[in-house]
């Protein structure tokens, strides 16, 4: 079953810590945080590195490419949708929606690319579609 109608998406909460992330999303760019102490990239973007707890992190533009790690299709919703974990080419894994596809043809390890979907009064949300 493919997504035939668009779901109304609530606007994300934007804080001073995530403002750059959402500003980039509005320009169609996906950012991750990278720790300059241990070299690990992470998502959801936050100032403190979850690996070494350093506060020496910087914004890095991600390629927008990844693979599906795991997913589930929610068919009981008014508009069916797929939610899953995508492993980004840069390493971090993010919880996201998989959109604009036939949900019955999704599979783990499938290549995906980022798309940005509008929200109700806020910045767009990064989601993924099969590449």
Predicted regions and their residues:
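Beta-strand/loop nucleic-acid-binding surfaces
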Residues: 93-102
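A broadly conserved sequence feature marking short terminus-proximal activation segments
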Residues: 1-30, 130-131
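Conserved hydrophobic positions within beta-strands
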Residues: 66-68, 98
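Cys/His-coordinated zinc-binding microdomains
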Residues: 36-39, 53
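OB-fold/S1-family single-stranded nucleic acid-binding modules
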Residues: 118-131
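Short nucleic-acid-contacting surface segments enriched for D/E, G, S/T with interspersed K/R
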Residues: 101-113
């Amino acid at each position: 079953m493919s997504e035939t109608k668009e779901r109304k998406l609530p606007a994300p909460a934007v804080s001073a810590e995530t403002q750059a992330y959402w500003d980039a999303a509005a320009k169609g760019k996906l950012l991750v945080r990278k720790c300059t102490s241990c070299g690990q990239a992470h998502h959801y973007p936050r100032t403190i590195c979850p690996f070494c707890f350093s506060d020496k992190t910087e914004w890095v533009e991600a390629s927008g490419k990844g693979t599906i790690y795991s997913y589930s299709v929610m068919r009981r919703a008014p508009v069916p949708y797929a939610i899953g974990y995508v492993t980004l080419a840069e390493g971090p894994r993010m919880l996201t929606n998989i959109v604009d596809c036939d949900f019955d043809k999704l599979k783990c390890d499938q290549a995906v690319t980022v798309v940005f979907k509008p929200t109700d009064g806020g910045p767009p949300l990064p989601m993924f579609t099969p590449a």
